[in-house]
A protein has these predicted regions:
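N-terminal Rossmann-like dinucleotide/flavin-binding domain of flavoprotein oxidoreductases
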Residues: 226-249
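Flavin-dependent oxidoreductase catalytic cores
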Residues: 1-193, 197-213, 221, 229
Length: 249
């Protein structure tokens, strides 16, 4: 059936377009297609000359066991799908793209260098920092606002029926109304009370626009409740919010 779909797609779009197929290399469900079964399927797909690349993920929407992997949260380790992508790449001559908690360009480079994939998909990472490719190209890795996998304003907003955004990047999804930041014509002195994530972001934006900013925090450390959130089991990556904001200030 897959081969028939690929053949019909090729017939409709012609030979000058690229055809890719996204698969779940392990659906993580009792009745789902598991990794060994997909390896056998991929061996057969390897002979399909009309397929240009394979996009490898894991999980499914059949139940809670698989659905958590559709948009994997922060408690799941980075680049955890790459071993399955590497196993598929070993039996195929096609270009392999892999996605799944790959949130930094240097991590993507490690995956590709290890021969586990040829390309990496980084959707939420691009929502968090649309300038990530340019920063990577210019050697500004420390300035990248890395996605933390919190799933609050991206997939969380999607399920609520509202526009996708990012808790670290309020411009995302609001580009036409909030951005890009422009330099102010009238420089002011700005006092920001509270050095939590909201206060840090407000101070950073005000400074970027050219204002003179004073950020006041009662405690000895910036970060607010994100410092507490990172102490919860499986939520340590919340602390990266503070690290990212420090880079912006």
């Amino acid at each position: 059936f897959i081969s028939e779909c690929i053949a019909q797609t090729r017939h409709l779009i012609g030979t000058d377009k690229i055809i890719g197929l996204r698969i779940s290399a392990d659906e993580h469900e009792p009745d789902g297609i598991d990794a060994p079964a997909w390896l056998q399927i991929c061996k057969r797909l390897n002979d399909n000359s009309e397929l240009d690349f394979l996009d490898v993920t894991v999980g499914s929407m059949m139940g809670p066991g698989g659905s958590v992997h559709v948009v994997p949260p922060m408690q799941i380790e980075h680049a955890y799908t790459t071993p399955k992508a590497g196993a598929i790449k070993a039996v195929m001559d096609k270009t392999i793209l892999v996605a799944g908690r790959i949130n930094q360009p240097q991590l993507a480079e490690e995956v590709i260098a290890a021969g586990q994939a040829d390309m990496c998909g980084m959707t939420r990472a691009m929502i968090s920092d649309p300038e990530m490719p340019n920063k990577a190209r210019n050697g500004q890795l420390g300035d990248i606002r890395a996605c933390i996998g919190c799933n609050q304003a991206c997939i969380g907003h999607y399920h609520m029926g509202v526009g996708i955004s990012c808790i670290q990047n309020p411009l995302s999804g609001r580009e036409l109304t909030l951005g890009p930041h422009t330099k102010t014509k009238k420089r002011k002195r700005v006092l920001v009370a509270g050095g939590g994530p909201a206060g840090m972001k407000a101070a950073a934006v005000a400074a970027q626009r050219g204002h003179s900013v004073c950020l006041c925090e009662a405690s000895s450390q910036l970060g607010g409740q994100a410092l507490l959130a990172q102490l919860l089991p499986g939520r340590s990556e919340f602390g990266a919010i503070v690290d990212n904001l420090h880079q912006e200030m």
